From Swiss-Prot:
It catalyses: ATP + H2O + cellular proteinSide 1 = ADP + phosphate + cellular proteinSide 2. Belongs to the SecA family. This is Protein translocase subunit SecA. Pfam families: P-loop_SecA, SEC-C, SecA_DEAD, SecA_PP_bind, SecA_SW. Part of the Sec protein translocase complex. Interacts with the SecYEG preprotein conducting channel. Has a central role in coupling the hydrolysis of ATP to the transfer of proteins into and across the cell membrane, serving both as a receptor for the preprotein-SecB complex and as an ATP-driven molecular motor driving the stepwise translocation of polypeptide chains across the membrane. May bind 1 zinc ion per subunit. GO terms for cellular component: cell envelope Sec protein transport complex; cytosol; plasma membrane. The gene is secA. The keyword Transferase does not apply.
Length: 913
C-alpha cells in the first residue's frame, strides 16, 4: 500500500545505487586530466604501481577510481573508444559482484574491461565467460591490444587445445573461454594424476557475458565427463521396432477418453508415461521377441534396465523431434541449443536417450557411456570467490539470481534514450493465417527499404518461413543450426536497406546488427585495402545508414512467443540499439505451442465472443496480459525445476567437494605413508570387530572366519586359533595388537623388496585409482537413487529428505570402501623396483588413454522426467558450511590439530570421513 509512495519519495533501490555510484564516477572523471598528461610508458607503468600498492595492503576498492581512469584513457588511445559515465557504473557493478543489465549496443564488452583490469591487478586471475568459442576468440582478440598495452597477459581456452597451451592460457592475467570449457576443465583437473597435469588456478573472479543464458537457461543441464560402457546397440534397435506399435492415450479436459492408448504425453513437463494397458502391451511384445522372460514383470529388479530402454525409446519418438531438438548431419545426431538455435557438436544426451534417437533415425548407434565426473553450472560458478555478469535482459529473473547465486541485478541507465516502438501482439486463429500476415508485413517493410529480422523458435519454423518467402520470390538469408558457419557474415549485413534475415531464437547473439550494414566487415573482406577504398566504403555505409534510419530502422518480427519473457525481450532488443529507431511485433496463433498448452482456452473463448472470422487478428491488451501470465507460469515452473535440481545436486556437491579435496590433498602430498597406516589400522579393527564382537565372550568368536578374512583382505595366513590355544592370556585387545604387528612385518617386507620411495609413490597411485573407480560407481548409484526417489512420496515420505539420508549412507560406505579396497590391493600386490621416470611416463600414458575415451555430455536435466517433489513434511535443505582454504605450513598427521581441539590432526581436521 505504501510501497509506491515510498518509491516516489526515496526512489527505487536501483535509482539509489546509481546515485551512490555517480559519486565515484565524479572521482574517476577528476583523474582524467591527470591521465591524459601521461605518456604511453607512464600510463603502462601505472599497472606495476597498482600491483605494488596492493602488495602493501591497499584494496581494490581503494584503487578503483584511479584504475578505472587508467583503463578509460588506455581505451581512448588503443581502441579509440572512451568509456561513458554509465559504462563506468556498469564496471563498478561488475566489480561489486553484481549483474549489470545493459541494453543492446550499450557496449557491454567495453564495460567488462574496467572490472577485468581492476581485478586482474590482484594477480589471482580473471575468467571472462562467453556462450560460444567464436565470441571467446572475438572478444579476447578485440580487447587483447588494450590489456597488453597495460602490461597484462591474455589467454584463450578452447576445446581440443594442447595441454601446454591451455595451461598457459589459465596462467595468464585474463582468460577467455566458454562456460562449457571452464566446467569441463574443472572436472578434468579433478581426474588428474599429477599436480603438473592440472590446468586451473584458484577460481578467483568471473565475468559472465550473457549471464542469463548461462546461469538460467543452461542451469538445468549437468556437465558430464563419461567413458564408454557396454554395447547395447542391438537392444536399442529391438526396442525401436516396438515403440511405433504403442498408441498415445488422449483425453479431453473433462476426462472423457477420446482415444484409448498405451501412454500419455504431458507437453508442459515434457514427460511421457506408460499406463496400465501400455505396460501390459509392451511386456507382451518384449516376451514375444525374447527380451523378457515368460511371466516376468518389467518392474522386477533385474529388468529395470529394460524399462529404462523402453522409456528412452518413448521419449526419443514422442518428445524429441528432428529439426527442432536435434538435426541429423553426416550420420550423427547433433543436439540443438533451444536458447540459441546453435548445434552442440560433441554433446550427447545421457541415460540412453541419445542412442534411442540414433536408433529412431536409423543411424549407427554409439556405445553407451558411464559417468566419470559431473557437476552443474550452478555449483561450478558458485565456487568462484566473486562472480558477476552482463546481459541485456536479467531483471525478469532477478529473484532467481538472488535466490540461487546471491547476485543482485543492477539496471544500468542507457547512454541514449530508447527510440524503438514495440507494437501489441497480433493473435490469429490458425498458424497459416499468422504466416500469411507475417509475409504481408515483410513485403511492406521491404517496399520501404527497411531491414527486417524474423525470429523463429525452431529450425523447422525457419525453414517453413523460408519456403513461403521463396514462393513469393522474396530474397532472404536463413540463420539456423544448419548454417551456423555463416552466422557472423549474415548478422553483419542484416541491417542493410531491404535486407531480410530469418534467425532461430537468439542466433547471432553477441553481434550487433548495425543499421546500413557493417562497414568494418566489408573492409576486412578486402585483401589489402587502400585508404581511398576504406574511405569510399565508409561513405557508402553512411548513406545506407541514413537511408535505413529515415525508413524507420530495423523491424523485428517474432513468429511466436517463447516460454520466457526474457528471450522475447532479447529478440526485441536486436532493434533500437544506442538510441536508433526501430520497431518490433509478435505474431501469434492459437496453434502455437505456448498458446495451445497454457493460454489457449481463455483467449479462444474471448475470440469466439468477438465473432472473429478467418484471417482476422485480435490486438488487445487483455490478450497480451493472458500470454504474459502464461509465460510467468512457465517461468515459475522452470524456476522450481532448476531450484529442485540445485537442492538435489547440493547433496552430491558436498560429497564432490570432499572427494576432490581428498584427491587434491593426495596429489600435493609427497608421502602418504601415515594415511595408509591409518587406513590399515581402521580396516583391520573393523574386520576383527565383525568376527570378534567387542566385549564378547571367547565362545562367541568366529576365529576361523577371521583367519579366512585376513587371508582374503591382507594376503596373510595367521594361525590365530593356535595362538589362542598356546597363550591363555591373549584377550581381544592384545590379539588386535599381535595381528597388527604381523601385518606390519609383512608390509615392511614389501618395502625391503622395492624401496621406501617407490612404495610411497605406488601407494599414492593405487589410492588415486581406487578412489576414482569407486567415485565413478558411486555417481552411477546416486543417479539411480535420484531417478527413483520421487516414488517415496507415495509412502508419505519426503523424497528430498529420503535422498539426503540415503545418499549420506552411500557416501559413508564409499569412504569405507576406499580404505578397504586400497589396503586390499596394496596387501596383495607384488612390488618390484621401477625407475620413477618410467613409472610416471606409464601413468601419464594411462591417463592419456583414458582421456581419449572420454565423452563430454549435457545430460537431460534431472527433475524434468518426474513431477516436482512435495515440500511438505521436510525442512529446508541443510546448508553445509565449507571449511576455509588454509595455506599455512602442513601438519604431520600425528601433530596436534591447528583448530585448538587438543586432538591429533589425523583424528580431527585430517580425518578422512
Amino acid at each position: 500500500m505504501f510501497a509506491p509512495l515510498l518509491k516516489k519519495l526515496f526512489g527505487s533501490k536501483n535509482e539509489r545505487e546509481v546515485k551512490r555510484m555517480l559519486k565515484t564516477v565524479q572521482i574517476v572523471n577528476a583523474f582524467e586530466e591527470q591521465m591524459v598528461a601521461l605518456s604511453d610508458e607512464q600510463l603502462r607503468a601505472k599497472t606495476e604501481e597498482f600491483k605494488a600498492r596492493i602488495a602493501k595492503g591497499e584494496t581494490l576498492d581503494q584503487l578503483l577510481p584511479e584504475a578505472f581512469a587508467v583503463a578509460r584513457e588506455a581505451g581512448k588511445r588503443v581502441m579509440g573508444m572512451r568509456h561513458f559515465d554509465v559504462q563506468l557504473i556498469g564496471g563498478m557493478t561488475l566489480h561489486e559482484g553484481q549483474i549489470a543489465e545493459m541494453r543492446t549496443g550499450e557496449g557491454k564488452t567495453l564495460v567488462g574491461t574496467l572490472a577485468v583490469y581492476l581485478n586482474a591487478l590482484s594477480g589471482k586471475g580473471v575468467h571472462v565467460v562467453t556462450v560460444n568459442d567464436y565470441l571467446a576468440r572475438r572478444d579476447a582478440n578485440w580487447m587483447r591490444p588494450l590489456y597488453e598495452f597495460l602490461g597484462l597477459t591474455v589467454g584463450i581456452v578452447t576445446p581440443f587445445q594442447p595441454p601446454e597451451e591451455k595451461r598457459a592460457a589459465y596462467a595468464a592475467d585474463i582468460t577467455y573461454g566458454t562456460n562449457n570449457e571452464y566446467g569441463f576443465d574443472y572436472l578434468r583437473d579433478n581426474m588428474a594424476f599429477s599436480m603438473d597435469d592440472k590446468f586451473q588456478r584458484e577460481l578467483n573472479f568471473a565475468v559472465i557475458d550473457e549471464v542469463d543464458s548461462i546461469l538460467i537457461d543452461e542451469a538445468r543441464t549437468p556437465l558430464i565427463i563419461s567413458g564408454q560402457a557396454e554395447d547395447s546397440s542391438k537392444l536399442y534397435t529391438e526396442i525401436n521396432r516396438l515403440i511405433p506399435k504403442l498408441e498415445q492415450h488422449i483425453e479431453e479436459v473433462e476426462g472423457e477418453v477420446t482415444k484409448a492408448g498405451h501412454f500419455t504425453v504431458d507437453e508442459k513437463t515434457r514427460q511421457v508415461e506408460l499406463n496400465e494397458a501400455g505396460h501390459q502391451f509392451i511386456e507382451e511384445m518384449l516376451t514375444e521377441v525374447g527380451l523378457l522372460a515368460e511371466g516376468e514383470s518389467l518392474y522386477s529388479a533385474h529388468n529395470l534396465g529394460l524399462l529404462t530402454h523402453v522409456y528412452a525409446g518413448l521419449r526419443a519418438h514422442k518428445l524429441f523431434n528432428r529439426n527442432v531438438e536435434y538435426i541429423v548431419s553426416d550420420g550423427q545426431v547433433l543436439l540443438v541449443d533451444e536458447h540459441t538455435g546453435r548445434t552442440m557438436p560433441g554433446r550427447r544426451l545421457s541415460e540412453g536417450l541419445h542412442q534411442a534417437i540414433e536408433a529412431k533415425e536409423g543411424l549407427n548407434i554409439q556405445a553407451e557411456s558411464q559417468t566419470l565426473a559431473s557437476t552443474t553450472f550452478q555449483n561450478y560458478f558458485r565456487l568462484y570467490n566473486k562472480l558477476s555478469g552482463m546481459t541485456g535482459t536479467a531483471d525478469t529473473e532477478a529473484f532467481e539470481f538472488h535466490q540461487i547465486y546471491n547476485l543482485a541485478v543492477m539496471v544500468i541507465p542507457p547512454n541514449k534514450p530508447l527510440a524503438r516502438k514495440d507494437f501489441n501482439d497480433l493473435v490469429y486463429l490458425t498458424a497459416e493465417e499468422k504466416y500469411a500476415a507475417i509475409v504481408t508485413d515483410i513485403k511492406a517493410c521491404i517496399a520501404e527499404n527497411r531491414p527486417v529480422l524474423v525470429g523463429t523458435a525452431t529450425i523447422e519454423t525457419s525453414e517453413h518461413m523460408s519456403n513461403l518467402l521463396n514462393k513469393e520470390g522474396i530474397e532472404h538469408k536463413v540463420l539456423n543450426a544448419k548454417f551456423h558457419e555463416k552466422e557472423a557474415e549474415i548478422i553483419a549485413q542484416a541491417g542493410r536497406p531491404g535486407a531480410l534475415t530469418i534467425a532461430t531464437n537468439m542466433a547471432g547473439r553477441g553481434t550487433d546488427i548495425l543499421l546500413g550494414g557493417n562497414w568494418e566487415v566489408e573492409v576486412a573482406n578486402l585483401e589489402d585495402p587502400t585508404p581511398e577504398q576504406i574511405a569510399q566504403i565508409k561513405a557508402d555505409w553512411q548513406k545506407r545508414h541514413q537511408q535505413v534510419i529515415e525508413a524507420g530502422g530495423l523491424h523485428v518480427i517474432a513468429s511466436e512467443r517463447h516460454e520466457s519473457r526474457r528471450i522475447d525481450n532479447q529478440l526485441r532488443g536486436r532493434a533500437g540499439r544506442q538510441g536508433d529507431t526501430g520497431s518490433s511485433r509478435f505474431y501469434l496463433s492459437l496453434e502455437d505451442s505456448l498458446m495451445r498448452i497454457f493460454a489457449s482456452d481463455r483467449v479462444k473463448n474471448f475470440m469466439k465472443a468477438l465473432g472473429m472470422q478467418s484471417g482476422e487478428a485480435i490486438e488487445h491488451r487483455m490478450v497480451t496480459n493472458a500470454i504474459e501470465k502464461a509465460q510467468r507460469k512457465v517461468e515459475g515452473r522452470n524456476f522450481d525445476i532448476r531450484k529442485q535440481l540445485l537442492e538435489f545436486d547440493d547433496v552430491a556437491n558436498e560429497q564432490r567437494k570432499v572427494i576432490y579435496h581428498m584427491r587434491n590433498t593426495l596429489l600435493a602430498a609427497e608421502n602418504i605413508g601415515e594415511t595408509i597406516a591409518d587406513f590399515r589400522e581402521e580396516v583391520l579393527n573393523n574386520l576383527i570387530s565383525q568376527h570378534i564382537p567387542p566385549q564378547s565372550l571367547p565362545e562367541q568368536w568366529n576365529v576361523a572366519g577371521l583367519e579366512s578374512a585376513l587371508n582374503t583382505d591382507f594376503a596373510v595366513q595367521l594361525p590365530i586359533q593356535q595362538w589362542l590355544d598356546e597363550d591363555d592370556k591373549l584377550h581381544e585387545d592384545s590379539l588386535r595388537e599381535k595381528i597388527m604387528a604381523q601385518l606390519l612385518v609383512a608390509y615392511n617386507e614389501k618395502e625391503d623388496q622395492a624401496s621406501a620411495e617407490a612404495l610411497r609413490s605406488f601407494e599414492k597411485q593405487i589410492l588415486l585409482r581406487v578412489l576414482d573407480d569407486l567415485w565413478k560407481d558411486h555417481l552411477s548409484t546416486m543417479d539411480h537413487l535420484r531417478h527413483g526417489i520421487h516414488l517415496r512420496g507415495y509412502a508419505q515420505k519426503n523424497p528430498k529428505q529420503e535422498y539426503k539420508r540415503e545418499s549420506f549412507t552411500l557416501f559413508q560406505e564409499l569412504l569405507d570402501s576406499i580404505k578397504r579396497d586400497t589396503i586390499r590391493v596394496l596387501s596383495h600386490v607384488q612390488v618390484r623396483r621401477e625407475d620413477p621416470e618410467e613409472e610416471e611416463a606409464r601413468l601419464r600414458q594411462d591417463a592419456e588413454e583414458l582421456a581419449s575415451r572420454m565423452q563430454f555430455e549435457h545430460a537431460p536435466a534431472p527433475g524434468i522426467e518426474q513431477p516436482l517433489l512435495d515440500e511438505e513434511g521436510g525442512g529446508a535443505p541443510v546448508a553445509v558450511a565449507s571449511e576455509p582454504v588454509r595455506n599455512d605450513q602442513k601438519l604431520g598427521r600425528n601433530e596436534l590439530c591447528w583448530c585448538g581441539s587438543g586432538k591429533k590432526f589425523k583424528h580431527c581436521h585430517g580425518q578422512i570421513n
